[in-house]
């Protein structure tokens, strides 16, 4: 049931011309309806508890929730039932069609799903251009948490601003042995960066890091094609290059794997 608890609560499955929730259809194959409804009930319990705590001053004053939300990474948003199979897509579901600012996420979790319901309009939300698997190690986030903790004695400390300069990275999770490894990056920076590089570190061996330079394909678009890499798991960091006085977008990190040849 825990896997079902990760499914969207909003209508994210397109069947015909309509978007429905997982619990509203029996047409999706391999879905256990009972577990789907149990998962929805679990979230309803959380919602009810949040509502009851709104009237509990002692509970409200015990802690502060500060969500850290990854953005600017290509993220799957919905799925369409096509010939009996679900096809995932980055297209926003109908319920979010008028919210184009929700079109991204951290590469795993859509932006809308990363924001707790009770904090939908909160200034405590923190947004960072980083991938899901690297959020907990992101230097800017850790520095932000450190500064927030050190200034808790100030009742009205200024809110930490969102990141202006960002890097968004599109990279597949898995590559075949003879398949080129294509990385695509979207860079928002004022002033423009002068270069972009990828530092690829083998995670499953002691081989030294490899550094590759992106080519700029359009104003904010950069592309890198790595012809081949030995089979293994790799960490990749995308790093902007600029002048000494320029404030650069913070690096973005992710993982990918090259599999052994399958005969």
How does the language model describe each region?
Residues 226-233:
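Surface-exposed, short loops/turns at beta-strand junctions within beta-sandwich domains
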Residues 235-239:
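Extracellular recognition modules
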Residues 186-192, 202:
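Extracellular acidic, Ser/Thr/Pro-rich low-complexity tracts
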Residues 215-225:
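Aromatic sugar-binding surface patches on proteins
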Residues 1-161:
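Helical cap/lid subdomain of alpha/beta-hydrolase-fold lipid enzymes
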Residues 243-263:
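Short beta-strand elements
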Residues 149-182, 188, 261-263:
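Short, compositionally biased P/S/T/A/G/V-rich stretches that sit at domain boundaries
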